[in-house]
């Protein structure tokens, strides 16, 4: 499978076989790192990390993955980057493309990362946009593969909550591309766009995936192997939307009762993080004082239970991001 010099922007750009090749490479690289026998395949390479949105996991994953493989990284933080402010995306791409072997972008519009690819002349990796989160999808798929005990095309998962943005969009496409049984449980007003749903159905025709969108959370999770969720209010949204979102999504909160509704005693909980699962953050305490909720999209009981595999999932961000870079740039 030749993934050399490929951009990594969204899963819709890849065949099921190519996505599986990334997962296989990630598993191989993970095993090599754990065994202390990792071979550096990116010596002398340099990666630019453009962050218009802050991040813990994505930044750390790219930096550790690159350094493990012998590559250098430059982190361009939100306050330091001139992209789109004093310098156009087109010009930024052409400058960085002369200095770096690859560029990671984490920001807002998908159009921005797509434009970078047109002018950079080097592989561009999408660390997150409003529309898609493809590196997270590889981590999620690898984590499900590790914990499922069966092939992904025999695995079922549900995403419950606000499904309009990058996680809902991307998980729907992931399941469709890999022939999985994928369900979205959300109010219809918070479903992915018609275009995303149509793309998922088109992919499912090729792979045999089963796609379900429902407003009934219990129906969504019935007989699944994994239950995913994400925060109910996204980065940059005003505090005023919290009450509206809580009213809309209270029935989609991942509680022990919702986990039990799967009917699967081995069901696992997944979350891309950060999660509002208790009062131990400033935002979590504010939510508790304002709305009386100790934990929002997931309860502390579920988050800290043996069913929670969120930290395996977080670790796999690094191994899968490493696979993307090695596939594109490795010797």
Swiss-Prot record:
Its EC number is 2.1.3.3. InterPro entries: Asp/Orn_carbamoyltranf_P-bd, Asp/Orn_carbamoylTrfase, Asp/Orn_carbamoylTrfase_sf, Asp_carbamoyltransf_Asp/Orn-bd, Orn/put_carbamltrans, OTCase_ArgI. Keywords: Amino-acid biosynthesis, Arginine biosynthesis, Cytoplasm, Transferase. L-ornithine binds at residues 166, 230, 234-235. The keyword Cytoplasm applies. It catalyses: carbamoyl phosphate + L-ornithine = L-citrulline + phosphate + H(+). It is found in: Cytoplasm. Carbamoyl phosphate binds at residues 55-58, 82, 106, 133-136, 272-273, 317. Signal peptide: none annotated. One of its GO terms (molecular function) is ornithine carbamoyltransferase activity. Its main location: cytoplasm. Pathway: Amino-acid biosynthesis; L-arginine biosynthesis; L-arginine from L-ornithine and carbamoyl phosphate: step 1/3. Belongs to the aspartate/ornithine carbamoyltransferase superfamily. OTCase family. Reversibly catalyzes the transfer of the carbamoyl group from carbamoyl phosphate (CP) to the N(epsilon) atom of ornithine (ORN) to produce L-citrulline. This is Ornithine carbamoyltransferase. The lineage of its organism: Bacteria, Pseudomonadati, Pseudomonadota, Betaproteobacteria, Neisseriales.
């Amino acid at each position: 499978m030749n993934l050399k010099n490929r951009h990594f922007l969204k899963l819709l750009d890849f065949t099921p076989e190519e996505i599986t090749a990334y997962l296989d490479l990630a598993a191989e690289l993970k095993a090599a790192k754990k065994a202390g026998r990792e071979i550096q395949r990116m010596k002398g390479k340099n990666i630019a990390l453009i962050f218009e949105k802050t991040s813990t996991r994505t930044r750390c994953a790219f930096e550790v993955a690159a350094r493990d493989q012998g590559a250098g990284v430059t982190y361009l933080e939100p306050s330091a980057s001139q992209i789109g402010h004093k310098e156009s995306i087109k010009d930024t791409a052409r400058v960085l493309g002369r200095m770096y072997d690859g560029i990671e972008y984490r920001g807002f519009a998908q159009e921005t990362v797509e434009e970078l690819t047109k002018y950079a002349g080097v592989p561009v990796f999408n660390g997150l946009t409003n529309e898609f989160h493809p590196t997270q999808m590889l981590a999620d798929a690898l984590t499900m593969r590790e914990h499922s005990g069966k092939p992904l095309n025999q695995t079922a998962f549900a995403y419950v909550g606000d499904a309009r943005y990058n996680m809902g969009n991307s998980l729907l496409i992931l399941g469709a591309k890999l022939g999985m049984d994928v369900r979205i449980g959300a109010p219809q007003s918070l479903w992915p766009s018609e275009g995303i749903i149509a793309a998922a159905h088109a992919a499912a025709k090729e792979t045999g995936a089963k796609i379900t969108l429902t407003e009934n959370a219990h129906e969504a999770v019935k007989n699944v192997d994994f239950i995913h969720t994400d925060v109910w209010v996204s980065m940059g949204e005003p505090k005023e939307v919290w009450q509206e979102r809580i009213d809309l999504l209270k029935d989609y909160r991942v509680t022990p009762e919702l986990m039990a509704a799967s009917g699967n005693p081995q069901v696992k909980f997944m979350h891309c993080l950060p999660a509002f699962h208790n009062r131990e953050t400033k935002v979590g305490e504010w939510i508790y004082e304002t709305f009386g909720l100790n934990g929002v999209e997931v309860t502390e009981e579920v988050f800290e239970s043996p069913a929670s595999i969120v930290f395996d999932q977080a670790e796999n961000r690094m191994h899968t991001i490493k696979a993307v870079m090695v596939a594109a740039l490795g010797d």
